[in-house]
Amino acid sequence: MLVHIIADYGMGDLAFAEVVQRIKVHLPDMEPVLTPVPAYSTIAAGFCIAQIGLHPSPPGTLIYHNVAPREDDPAARAHNAGERLAYARLPTGVRVIGVNAGYAFSFIKDVAEKLRWAASSAEGSQFRSRDVFPQAAAAIALGLPAALGHDLDPESIPSPPVSAVAYVDGYGNLKTTIAYDPNRVRPGKRITVRINERQHEATVSDGAFAVPHGELAFAPGSSGWTLRDGSTVRWIELFLRGGSAWNLFDRPAPGSFVAIH
């Protein structure tokens, strides 16, 4: 069973090893794939969940995610309580299990065939993704009848922010929540892009490499998926050919607003 683990532990962090080990106790045949996202970045986690989950996957694929900033209640929390564990089943057959925090389920809420709460405690450990959730995730993966709770209302999940940085890839390309519309794109047009305190000129194009070396492109990237109505969304990327757009804009965090002029 392919199990994608999307979490904000940090690449190479001991936490990934501990979580993999604990899940494997309950799912011995699991094949883990680790995808780190920045600390507390539910938008990056949500983007990764959709990009992985809404494309063809091996039968039985599971996405287990944990980005839990515990921002659902600002008061002191007894017993290390935090956001609850939730479940989604996608049209691809991929099952998603993880904390319903921030934007974690935002990119899939309107596509999911099923949204349910998991029948799991939301407290009991500072490290719930190791000590509490693996057993619950395994119960869901194995189809145990008592593993799921009530339906989760998609309207209670926030929509993704518009015109924001969603994810930064290893090349420093900035994947955004700006949807590509071929009817509105005029290749070659020069625009000004501002993120936080940094502002740079970019060239609008229909492909990232359609600009000279050293130029910044505003173009449809490699990320996107099929929506409920059968249409396909592709997300705009900021791509610095031969460099890092992330560094150019002073390393903006996922969630940063992208202003276009």
Model-predicted segments: where are they?
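N-terminal glycine-rich anion-binding loop in soluble enzyme alpha/beta folds
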Residues: 1-38
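Residue-level marker for buried hydrophobic side chains located in beta-strands
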Residues: 3-5, 63, 166, 238
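A conserved acidic, glycine/proline-rich C-terminal tail/linker
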Residues: 177-252
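Short acidic, Gly/Ser-rich segments with clustered Asp/Glu that frequently serve as metal-coordination loops
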Residues: 9-13, 171-174, 243-245
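Conserved active-site and cofactor/substrate-binding residues in soluble primary-metabolism enzymes
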Residues: 14, 18, 40, 44, ...
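Active-site histidine-anchored catalytic micro-motif
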Residues: 26-46, 58-133
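Anionic-ligand-binding alpha/beta catalytic cores of soluble enzymes and soluble regulatory domains
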Residues: 108-192
